[in-house]
A protein has these predicted regions:
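Active-site or pore-adjacent capping/gating segments
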Residues: 115-169
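Glycine-rich and small/hydrophobic secondary-structure elements
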Residues: 12-22, 96-114, 139-148
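Short, glycine-/Ser/Thr-/acidic-enriched flexible segments
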Residues: 44-47, 86-89, 107, 114, ...
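Generic beta-strand/beta-sheet core signal
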Residues: 40-42, 82-86, 102, 120-125, ...
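Gly/Pro-rich turn-and-neighbor structural signature
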Residues: 6-30, 34-97
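Conserved phosphate-binding loops in nucleotide/dinucleotide-binding enzymes
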Residues: 91-101, 131-135, 166
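Active-site lining segments that contact anionic ligands and/or coordinate catalytic metals
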Residues: 34-38, 76-80, 104-106, 114-119, ...
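Short, small-residue-biased leader/transition segments that mark boundaries at the very start
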Residues: 1-2
Length: 169
């Protein structure tokens, strides 16, 4: 059911491994190199799948750093990534319905504290119709500010820890 999410993790990690394995660097410098690798991910409307994807990405990257590349410092093993929400899913016929789509896609990559994105550009609600106007772009910024500053989303630990649904996936 979450084939796209599994593929995104697999391709992302495989690409990073191929780059890291090809780099000719002294073993003592590998942790610093590993710590500079970053990813750009997509977030779609499948909220549970997207949340699980980022949690898996984060944990697998940490494990890869420890076990394959002997990176001891946790800070250097941190999964560094930015996310673009899936603007391909925005509709032209009823653009006002894109608002909840964008918010759900943003929540999928921000709610899980250990897998929270550090960068989240959001599309404009009417982007399916054409280039956004300045007000439309400002609206996207306001969504980010509301999520970050007017809610308690960033004040809590991983609210999905212990979830049977998350553990099963």
């Amino acid at each position: 059911v979450y084939k796209r999410q599994v593929q995104e993790v697999a391709f992302g990690l495989a690409n990073a491994i191929s780059v890291l394995d090809a780099i000719e660097v002294a073993p003592e410098k590998m942790p610093a190199v590993f710590g500079r690798i970053s990813f750009f991910c997509n977030s779609g409307i499948r909220f549970i799948g997207e949340t699980c994807k980022m949690r898996a990405f984060t944990r697998m990257w940490d494990q890869l750093g420890r076990e394959r590349y002997s990176v001891e410092e946790a800070k250097l093993r941190r999964f560094r990534y930015g996310v673009q929400v899936n603007s391909l899913g925005l509709t032209e016929s009823q653009p006002e319905n894109n608002v909840p789509r964008i918010v759900l896609e943003a929540l999928g990559v921000t709610l899980s504290k250990d897998a929270r994105t550090r960068s989240l550009p959001l599309p404009a609600w009417n982007e399916a119709l054409g280039l956004p106007r300045p007000w439309d772009q400002q609206w996207s910024l306001r969504i980010q500010q509301i999520l970050a500053n007017e809610t308690d989303l960033l004040e809590n630990g991983d609210i999905f820890e212990g979830s049977k649904v998350m553990a099963a996936l």
